[in-house]
Amino acid sequence: MKILISNDDGFQAPGIVALHDALKDIADVEVVAPEHNNSAKSNALTLAAPLYVHKAHNGFRYVTGTPADCVHIALKGLLGYRPDLVVSGINNGANMGDDTIYSGTVGAAMEAYLFGIPAIAFSQIEKGWAHVDAAAQVARRLVQQIERERMLDGGAFLLNVNVPNRPLQELKPIQVCRLGRRHSAEKVITQESPRGETMYWIAGAGGAKDSGEGTDFHATAAGHIALTPLQIDLTDHANLGQWRETVARLGN
């Protein structure tokens, strides 16, 4: 089994190091990750500037670009082979509910999925890397189970996994659940620059809004690992008919 590992926190982040160490003896692993933190870059690709790839002392390769850049470059020329699985993370903080739209961690996994390769994004629900090795063991066990069941042979899938920051023995079993929703983001933070200009900082994400039973928020709050299968199709299928009728009334 060949696995490509990436992330959005950068190639030196504890999460990607722990993930690599947990997977390196069950697969041939290659790390291609951003040079610097690229949180909230989603699926962004760098199109107006060249990208450079460097190799760190530990063998990790790092790119002067986004998480999606890293996976794109790796799959379309850098590796020279097609990996069986792409794993992204472990992210420093949750990627639940609406977070998945913005997440560079999910974006890296989604880039692989767009190329028809199975992919998993792993995140811890709290920042700070507490018990990151436990989250890495969760990743290892899930990857092993997926391989045992030969799911890598059945076409591409995209999974989003969020792990509570707990010791391994205190983690509750994986629950397969849907994405919840967050309240809208907090008000932007304004400051005055030394030149007297107003600066704006994006504030934190809103709290959980839809966190009922069956959501990723509910599962992780109860100590469970949350696993959500994702898809690319953004079509609002339920309202296609309504919009066809509306457009029809416009005439020619």
From Swiss-Prot:
Its EC number is 3.1.3.5. It comes from the Bacteria. It catalyses: a ribonucleoside 5'-phosphate + H2O = a ribonucleoside + phosphate. It holds the Pfam family SurE. Its cofactor is a divalent metal cation. GO terms for cellular component: cytoplasm. Gene3D superfamilies: Survival protein SurE-like phosphatase/nucleotidase. It is found in: Cytoplasm. Binds 1 divalent metal cation per subunit. Keywords: Cytoplasm, Hydrolase, Metal-binding, Nucleotide-binding. HAMAP family: SurE. Belongs to the SurE nucleotidase family. This is 5'-nucleotidase SurE. The gene is surE.
